[in-house]
């Protein structure tokens, strides 16, 4: 097989990008597909393999086995490697990376010029792209004369000036001020609609605004995939649950409930997908912090972190002795780990008896009246109707 495969325009019937390869030194084995015109987010904890995926697609890394394909063409394998400068792939990262000695318009024109476009045509294209990102009046400024948001706009114009087949976004908003990021996010959403995009981010706002689909990676493997709505509605890992803004509680199926390792029973609304839901199978519950009420435990029997004996299960039908008497609800003894005030609301993080953590979002006034502090014994109460139960995939 040749070292440099044909880089001509691809057939539209193939996915825009495919990773079906392994990098042994990083213990990464990825199987990812990006449909043409779709925007895919890759999310996961640090060291999960996200940067490796971008490096494989960009041409900065060659796989040890398997293939990297762009629109059906093999551009990376143990025997084949199309170098980065010959791939129609562009990257937009945290830092704009503009050439300091060139004006904004010359930075944008640099890509087309490097691909053989004549200077006048390249400058015309550059000015068009600058106008499209709202920077037409900044064409003659050098990078040091631009604000962070302006520089990132110019970097986007530069990326799109070469009409790329694939756009890689590596946390492009992470270095921007919170006042600037929303405008750049809207701009990216507008300019990248209909293009093939691979996005790496830790921000759920980026998922909703900039992605159609998402894959969750951990330890170099894909652990979950689907549309953004599907994955965030049914997170299968702690990382995905944090992105979705919910707590994830794991356990074993016990009839129609979930039995945690610490002895608590979790009752909720079971997924309509019955496959995998059977006694003894692993399952997860998702809990929205806004649905969790916090009550001070007036007579704690011991730390939920280190119970002195096997705890008795608690469930909506068998409430804790200290739980409020109400309609069917879950009630779980817990220990407050941290409080995060944010204006009128406070996020309370508490550990169940097996160490699993559940968040509750309550008013800051309530937190003060309850005299909550790390180490406080509480009862977490949440309606069964507000807990979603899923078989563990």
Task: List where the protein language model places each region.
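A short, proline-enriched helix->beta-strand linker immediately N-terminal to the Walker B motif
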Residues: 161-165
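Glycine/charge-rich catalytic "coupling/switch" loops of P-loop NTPases
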Residues: 264-340, 364-393
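ABC ATPase NBD coupling module
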Residues: 75-90, 114, 231, 235
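Conserved ABC ATPase signature
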Residues: 142-146, 150
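Internal alpha/beta loop-helix hairpins
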Residues: 189, 201-264, 298
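Conserved ABC ATPase "signature" region
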Residues: 120-138
